[in-house]
A protein has these predicted regions:
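A penicillin-recognizing enzyme superfamily signal
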Residues: 1-8, 20, 72, 76, ...
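Predominant activation on well-ordered alpha-helical scaffold segments within soluble catalytic domains
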Residues: 25-26, 83, 95, 126-129, ...
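Short, solvent-exposed loop/turn segments at secondary-structure boundaries
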Residues: 40, 85, 255-258
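Structural motif corresponding to the C-terminal cap of alpha-helices
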Residues: 81, 102-105, 203-206
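A glycine-rich, coil/turn loop motif that links secondary-structure elements
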Residues: 112-120
Length: 264
């Protein structure tokens, strides 16, 4: 803090790259896709408008696998599959979905957003990942959970959740208490379950397999931007979500072989 008061977690706007892809795939699952749906992984050239060059997105390593499952596309972080999914979903759906999750405020409606071209913060992106492990509900980050006095009495609690029938002495032949919450349901619990399973595959077989030997049930996604300028890894267990970003304050390449899978 003595060197810089700038908070790179909450203030630095950077492109998330492939770390944004899980939200494209989650939206696809909300729109009648399944993890086994086949999507073409092949070259693609798109018009960007008059007086603009044709856009030709590429896969990392410039390899193509042909028709591939949605699960494999996320595990292997296939750019061309992701763009095709985005074309099918439509940009308005993608932009609205990202805004509901708090990732972006008003991003440009460009297909490149599906590959993480719009800028966000590490805090916003990590918070959005929490929705996967919370059944599709958006949980906003807080700094203070609760405050207790010297005798252990809670004098402040951030969450004011109502628990109906929690004061019952016995639960025999009675309804089990339910704790309500005020979290917004962004997508279905079924989608959250499927995406979590697919992101577990990223750790087991995909770009995050360097974490495979950690003795934890973990899911997550790597991210790398053009010229290896920004590298990311956002991961989570059932109890904790962690976001890692590596990059310079003044954007420049970290090196030819520096990726989210390696550096972050």
């Amino acid at each position: 803090f003595k060197k810089s008061e700038f908070n790179r977690v909450s203030q630095a706007l950077r492109q998330p790259g492939s770390a944004f892809k899980p939200f494209i795939y989650a939206l696809a699952l909300e729109n009648n896709y399944s993890p086994s749906t086949l999507v073409l992984d092949a070259p693609l050239v798109l018009e960007q408008g008059s007086d603009l060059k044709m856009w030709q997105p590429e896969n990392y390593g410039k390899k193509f696998y042909g028709p591939s499952t949605l699960r494999m596309g996320l595990e292997k972080s296939r750019n061309l599959m992701t763009v095709r999914i985005a074309q099918d979903l439509g940009l308005k759906k993608i932009v609205n979905f990202s805004k509901k999750l708090g990732i972006y405020d008003n991003p440009n409606e460009l297909l490149s957003i599906s590959l993480g071209s719009a800028e966000t913060t590490l805090l916003k992106l990590t918070s959005a990942y929490c929705s996967f492990v919370n059944g599709g509900k958006l949980v906003k980050p807080i700094l203070i959970d609760r405050i207790q006095d010297s005798e252990g009495n809670t004098i402040f609690n951030t969450e004011k959740r109502e628990c109906k029938k929690c004061n019952q002495i016995s639960f025999l032949n009675k309804e089990v208490p339910k704790i309500s919450d005020n979290f917004n349901q962004i997508f279905t619990p079924e989608t959250a379950y499927q995406i979590t399973s697919m992101l577990e595959g990223v750790i087991q077989r995909g770009t995050g397999r360097k974490l495979k030997n950690i003795n934890l049930d973990m899911a997550g996604k790597t991210g790398t931007t053009n010229k290896n300028t920004d590298t990311w890894f956002i991961g989570f267990t059932s109890k904790l979500a962690i976001g890692v970003y590596v990059g310079f304050d003044n954007p420049k390449s970290l090196g030819k072989y520096e990726t989210g899978a390696k550096t972050a």
